[in-house]
Amino acid sequence: MNLHEYQGKQLFAEYGLPVSTGFAVDTPEAAAEACDKIGGNEWVVKAQVHAGGRGKSGGVKLVRSKEDAKAFAQQWLGKRLVTYQTDANGQPVTKILVESCTDIAKELYLGAVVDRSSRRIVFMASTEGGVDIEKIAHDTPEKILKATIDPLVGAQPFQGRELAFQLGLEGKQVAQFAKIFVGLAKLFKDHDLALLEVNPLVIKADGDLHCLDAKINIDANAMYRQPKLKTFHDPSQDDPREAHAAKFELNYVALEGNIGCMVNGAGLAMGTMDIVNLHGGKPANFLDVGGGATKERVTEAFKIILSDSNVAAVLVNIFGGIVRCDMIAEGIIGAVKEVGVKIPVVVRLEGNNAELGAKVLAESGLNIIAATSLTDAAQQVVKAAEGK
């Protein structure tokens, strides 16, 4: 689950980290009032969406009057912001963050992720702040500094000081960086985060360090342990198909291809997507119906897949283990009839009662293409999607 910038900064403040004074507002009038509360004569207004690249798309602006802040809120509230990290429809803007202006001398980067290879939280820092860190890691990986956190003892101040020296920080900045480093590490662990970024972490004109941005992603599997963070969820930022799928305990992720995929098991689903790609196709989604693939869930899965107008064919790949393939076949037939599927459907069944399942499909009288193997299924669905 992603958090908005203002929510991330709220958590930063709770851990004693330096952030700008700001208010998240949902009306133009409140934006003007926020300027009065903050004081001064310059403010930064930011559209709140779960995507980067807001500045380049006009979603971040420096304003010098309450009227300009109000006008910015009027411009964006209720609209959709399109950035390089969103699809063509963009993300809806329901909140504007109004905060004090910061005089920046230099921009740095500080972030943390769970590194699967070392099974540790790893912090990354760079002197190249304010830009896409993935690009820096690709073009100049030597500019990425790393510190691995030992789970038994946690983040240590000396690790923060080492990074600070490598970043070229001096004097009071070293202690400030170490405090931010340890605070972020505690925040990461306490709230089961999957990713945390401060981009940029800035050196102000007076030499102090300041967290100018906050990007936080929480491990969805740990949300049951984070009741407070559940209240931070903004459903307006969710893909409507993914949100609908979650109601039926279907794991769905929308992609940009034209071949719908329905599979039981996350690993098999990823393998199915890979083999579709291998044979020249483009998956329209990841969809794992899980072990209990009932007719109702298969029906909902079809509805979700077909709600994507780009889908030209559907591949159903089921491995029968606890669930029998003949039961799955009956569910597919019922779903195809109920939903009224008009595009080609390729089905590959393997495992428990696979032959009986194939027979049920063949006798259904429906235009369902039975595949003999996963390779055959991928080839068939790619041809079907191309109209061949």
Curated annotation (Swiss-Prot):
It catalyses: succinate + ATP + CoA = succinyl-CoA + ADP + phosphate; GTP + succinate + CoA = succinyl-CoA + GDP + phosphate. GO terms for biological process: succinyl-CoA metabolic process; tricarboxylic acid cycle. Mg(2+) binds at residues 199, 213. GO terms for cellular component: cytosol; succinate-CoA ligase complex. Gene3D superfamilies: ATP-grasp fold, A domain, ATP-grasp fold, B domain, Succinyl-CoA synthetase domains. Keywords: ATP-binding, Ligase, Magnesium, Metal-binding, Nucleotide-binding, Tricarboxylic acid cycle. Pfam families: ATP-grasp_2, Ligase_CoA. Its cofactor is Mg(2+). ATP binds at residues 46, 53-55, 99, 102, 107. InterPro entries: ATP-grasp (IPR011761), ATP-grasp_succ-CoA_synth-type (IPR013650), ATP_grasp_subdomain_1 (IPR013815), Succ-CoA_synthase_bsu_CS (IPR017866), SUCC_ACL_C (IPR005811), Succ_CoA_ligase-like_bsu (IPR005809), Succinyl-CoA_synth-like (IPR016102). Heterotetramer of two alpha and two beta subunits. Belongs to the succinate/malate CoA ligase beta subunit family. This is Succinate--CoA ligase [ADP-forming] subunit beta. It comes from Pseudomonas fluorescens (strain Pf0-1). The gene is sucC.
